[in-house]
């Protein structure tokens, strides 16, 4: 392109490609029929995702990468909040017991049991989230089912 002339669309495309390159990423493109694209794009919008993000989620899921859905995230937050509450309750009971050692320990025992249950729930949830082999199998099953 000479000085003073206007850039062509191919010049702009080349300049954009040069600016967009980010280390560690690969650009993947695919051809979809109009109906496929419309259906896919509609589903992505219903979930509040861009087309690019929806494709990335699908690829990551097929590859077995970690994706946590909103329901799982809410369950985890609820368990963590429960653990925090139980921890405070146990500390208060222990403090009360230190002041008055004759009090009944049944309340402390019940809180400790609930605390253990919450930790077991959290452990189970984390194991299911972090199971790489299960995530890969789930993602590959989605891909195979689509074929």
Curated annotation (Swiss-Prot):
<protein>
    <recommendedName>
        <fullName>T-DNA border endonuclease VirD1</fullName>
        <ecNumber>3.1.-.-</ecNumber>
    </recommendedName>
</protein>
<dbReference type="GO" id="GO:0051170">
    <property type="term" value="P:import into nucleus"/>
</dbReference>
<dbReference type="GO" id="GO:0003677">
    <property type="term" value="F:DNA binding"/>
</dbReference>
<keyword id="KW-0255">Endonuclease</keyword>
<keyword id="KW-0192">Crown gall tumor</keyword>
<dbReference type="GO" id="GO:0004519">
    <property type="term" value="F:endonuclease activity"/>
</dbReference>
<keyword id="KW-0614">Plasmid</keyword>
<dbReference type="InterPro" id="IPR009933">
    <property type="entry name" value="VirD1"/>
</dbReference>
<dbReference type="Pfam" id="PF07328">
    <property type="entry name" value="VirD1"/>
</dbReference>
<keyword id="KW-0378">Hydrolase</keyword>
<comment type="function">
    <text>Tumor formation by A.tumefaciens involves the transfer and integration of a defined segment (T-DNA) of Ti plasmid DNA into the plant nuclear genome. The virD operon encodes a site-specific endonuclease that cleaves at a unique site within both 24 bp direct repeats flanking the T-DNA.</text>
</comment>
<keyword id="KW-0540">Nuclease</keyword>
């Amino acid at each position: 392109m000479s000085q003073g002339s206007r850039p062509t669309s191919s010049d702009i495309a080349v300049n954009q490609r040069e600016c967009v390159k980010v280390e560690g990423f690969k650009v993947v493109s695919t051809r979809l029929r109009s109906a496929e694209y419309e259906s896919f794009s509609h589903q992505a919008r219903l979930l509040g995702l861009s087309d690019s993000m929806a494709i990335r989620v699908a690829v990551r899921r097929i590859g077995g990468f970690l994706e946590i859905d909103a329901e799982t995230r809410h369950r985890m937050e609820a368990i963590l909040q429960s653990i925090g509450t139980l921890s405070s309750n146990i500390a208060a009971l222990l403090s009360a017991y230190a002041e008055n050692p004759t009090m009944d320990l049944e309340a402390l025992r019940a809180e400790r049991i609930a605390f253990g249950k919450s930790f077991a729930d959290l452990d189970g949830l984390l194991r299911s989230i972090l199971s790489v082999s299960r995530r890969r199998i789930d993602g590959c099953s989605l891909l195979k089912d689509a074929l």
